[in-house]
Structure formats: structure tokens, C-alpha cells
Amino acid sequence: MSIISRKGLIMANETTTKNDSTNVSFGKFKVGGYAYAAPVGTALPTDSESALDPAFQLIGYLSEDGITNTTDTDTAEVKDANGTTVMKVVSSYSESYQFVLIEFLRKAAAQMRYGNDAVTGKDKSMVIKHQMPDDTPVSLVFEIVATGNVKDRTVIGSATRSEFGDRQMHSSDVLGYDLTVNANDMGDGVTSIEYIGIPKGQSL
């Protein structure tokens, strides 16, 4: 398990021969909005800066722990007659993202947790049906601004709700929706794409 790290972009035709402190960065989220959800099939961004499709809804603030990106791999070993491992290959791979939505009164945040059909109403005035979790996949985008104003955008084309944290309701803790989503295959085994410092219209 690892908290999402932010690295400077090295272009394919560049050669670096020295350590560079400007490539070290904190992962600060974009001011004004940084977590968005849309139905699968919505046009996905392919760079760090272009405007998102209008179908993407802001799902609000995340807790101070931000996002935890976890990868899980299994390996298979091949051994010879002496029990010596002669080959080890990765046999499976999966990726997930965990975060806590703390805009408890935002309709889009509640829908992200419970599913669109389980939530009716509007911000600050909702009815939420607590029921079997909705496994309808959604597309997610998270936006970070790295040191030096380098834009870092993570795109999950198909995310399925997979785990839900406990919800405590008392006066000393903020209300929120703690959930983990599984990043499904977007094609060719890719589960999510991160665009770091890629201007609008540029591709690598």
C-alpha cells in the first residue's frame, strides 16, 4: 500500500545526469475542486489541463488523509527437481483507491457512496436508502497540483465500489463517506492513467 506519490515528468528525449530537487513534490490537491465522478462512457481527459466533460460532477472535499492508491499482485513460481526457483512471474494484478468524502450534505458525494438511484433530493435536503451496495461502475478523475504548478491528473475509466468504511456519528468527528473503489481494466490491462505535466493537445 502506498500514498499516491508525485514525480516530475522526464520527457523521452531528455537525459538527466544529476539529482534535481525540483522533481521532489508534495501532493496538494487543486484549489476549488479536485475529485469528480461521471457515468462510464463519458469522454475521458487525455492530458493534465483540458476541461472535463460536463458530465463529470464534483464530489467535494476529501479528508486530510487524501487518497490511498493500493496495488495487489500475485506471483507464480516455477521450480526445478531440486526445489530451486527458476522462474517467477506475476500472475495477477489489481488496483484500488481509498478516500473519505467529507461533504456529507452534498448529493453527489452521497450518490458516490450509495449509488445514484439510492439518493433523491438536493444538497442539504436528501433521502438516502441504505441498501445493497450499487456495483454500477463510474469514471473518476482526481486533480493535484505538484510543486512548481505541475498539473497531475489521475483518470480511472471504470471504478467499482468495493469496500465501505464504518461511519461514526458523534460530536467530535466529521461525518463522511469512507469508500474504496476497484479500478477495472480500461483496455490492454490498464486500470488507471496518470497525466503529469501534459499540456492540452500534447501526447506522449
Residue ranges and their predicted role:
Residues 1-5:
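Gram-positive cell-envelope targeting signals
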Residues 150-204:
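Mixed-charge, glycine-accented linear interaction segment located at domain edges/termini
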Residues 96-100, 139-143, 178-182:
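Beta-strand secondary-structure signal
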Residues 35, 140-142, 195:
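Hydrophobic beta-strand residues in large extracellular and virion-surface proteins
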Residues 6-109, 158-176:
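Solvent-exposed edge beta-strands and adjacent loop segments
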Residues 106-157:
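Short helix-loop boundary/capping segments
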Residues 101-105, 144-148, 183-187:
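Beta-strand elements of well-folded, non-transmembrane domains
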